[in-house]
C-alpha cells in the first residue's frame, strides 16, 4: 500500500449501524469484527469493506485463486507467496493515528485446515463445496473507536466509486442517532430449532482420556477439544437477528459476523488469540491456565 493513497476521514456511524451494514450488504461489507468492550483491550469495532482478490480452499481440497497469480496448490503456501509479493512499507502513522486498519486481508481458517498441516488427524470430512479456508484482500473499513465514540472511514487505494458505495449504504440507514434494527426480530433458538445433532458423548469422553494420556506422557502441555453441534432450523434464519441475539446473550470484546461463500459465520469470544504489531507478538490465553484452588486435590473435587 502506498501511504500517499491512504484516506482517513471521520463519518457519522454508530456500532448498531455497522452491524446493520454487514447484515444487509454482505457483498460490500464481508465482515464485522465487533466489540462490546469499553476498555483498551477491545477498543475497536472494524467493519471491513471493498473485497477484492481472494484465495478460497474448498472442502474437496481444490484451491480457487481469483485475481491472484500463483501456481501453488497449497492454500497456506499460496497465501504466503501472495502476502510476500503484496507487502509494502507501512503507511505514515501520522495519517492513521492509532487506527488498527490500513488495508489488509480478511482471513478465515477452518478447523479442518489442520488436516492440511498435520496429516493423519482423521478429522470429520467437510462437504466438497464447503469453505475450508479463505483469504480476501480488503482495502477499506469503517472503524469505530469505543473509547472516544467516533467512527472513521479508512481507505487504502480504494476506487472512488467503491468509497461512494460505502457512503451511500451508510446514508441509506438514516441519521447516526437513529436505531438500526436488524432485518428481522431477534430469534428464540428454542422455538426456531427443529433438530439438533452433536458428537456422541462417548466419543468426546474418549478424546478427553486420550488428551490426559498425551499430557501425562509429556507429548503436549495442553489440549483444546472442540465439539460440534448442528442445528436444523424450522425456517430460514436471519443472520443479523441471530447475531443480535448472540450479542445480547454473550457480549464479548472479540465477536464477528462474516459472510463467506455459501455461509455466514457468527462468533463471540472473550479472548484475543494473538496480536502482532511490528516486532511485538502478544498472546492472551485465558482457558486452562490457572488453578482454581490452592492444591491439586482441591482442584480435582
Give residue spans per PLM region.
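Extended alpha-helical targeting/anchoring segments
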Residues: 1-301
Amino acid at each position: 500500500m502506498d501511504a500517499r493513497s491512504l484516506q482517513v476521514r471521520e463519518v457519522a456511524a454508530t456500532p448498531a449501524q455497522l452491524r446493520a451494514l454487514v447484515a444487509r450488504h454482505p457483498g460490500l461489507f464481508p465482515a464485522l469484527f465487533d466489540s462490546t468492550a469499553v476498555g483498551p483491550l477491545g477498543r475497536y469495532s472494524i467493519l471491513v469493506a471493498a473485497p477484492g482478490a481472494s484465495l478460497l480452499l474448498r472442502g474437496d481440497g481444490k484451491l480457487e485463486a481469483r485475481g491472484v497469480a500463483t501456481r501453488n496448490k497449497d492454500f497456506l503456501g499460496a497465501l504466503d507467496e501472495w502476502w510476500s509479493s503484496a507487502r509494502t512499507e507501512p503507511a505514515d502513522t501520522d495519517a492513521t493515528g492509532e487506527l488498527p486498519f490500513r488495508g489488509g486481508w480478511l482471513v478465515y481458517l477452518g478447523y479442518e485446515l489442520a488436516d492440511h498441516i498435520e496429516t493423519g488427524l482423521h478429522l470429520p470430512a467437510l462437504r466438497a463445496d464447503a469453505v475450508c479456508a479463505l483469504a480476501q484482500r480488503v482495502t477499506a473499513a469503517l472503524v469505530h473507536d469505543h473509547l472516544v465514540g467516533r467512527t472513521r472511514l479508512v481507505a487504502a487505494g480504494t476506487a472512488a466509486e467503491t468509497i461512494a458505495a460505502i457512503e451511500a449504504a451508510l446514508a441509506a440507514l438514516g441519521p447516526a442517532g437513529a436505531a438500526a434494527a436488524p432485518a428481522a426480530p431477534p430469534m428464540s433458538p428454542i422455538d426456531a430449532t427443529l433438530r439438533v445433532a452433536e458428537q456422541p458423548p462417548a466419543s468426546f469422553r474418549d478424546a478427553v482420556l486420550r488428551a490426559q494420556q498425551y499430557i501425562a506422557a509429556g507429548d503436549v502441555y495442553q489440549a483444546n477439544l472442540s465439539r460440534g453441534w448442528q442445528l436444523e432450523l424450522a425456517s430460514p434464519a436471519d443472520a443479523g437477528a441471530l447475531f443480535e441475539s448472540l450479542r445480547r446473550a454473550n457480549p464479548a470484546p472479540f465477536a464477528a459476523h462474516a459472510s463467506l461463500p455459501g455461509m455466514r459465520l457468527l462468533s463471540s469470544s472473550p479472548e484475543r488469540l494473538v496480536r502482532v504489531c511490528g516486532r511485538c507478538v502478544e498472546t492472551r490465553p485465558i482457558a486452562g491456565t490457572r488453578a482454581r484452588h490452592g492444591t491439586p486435590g482441591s482442584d480435582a473435587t
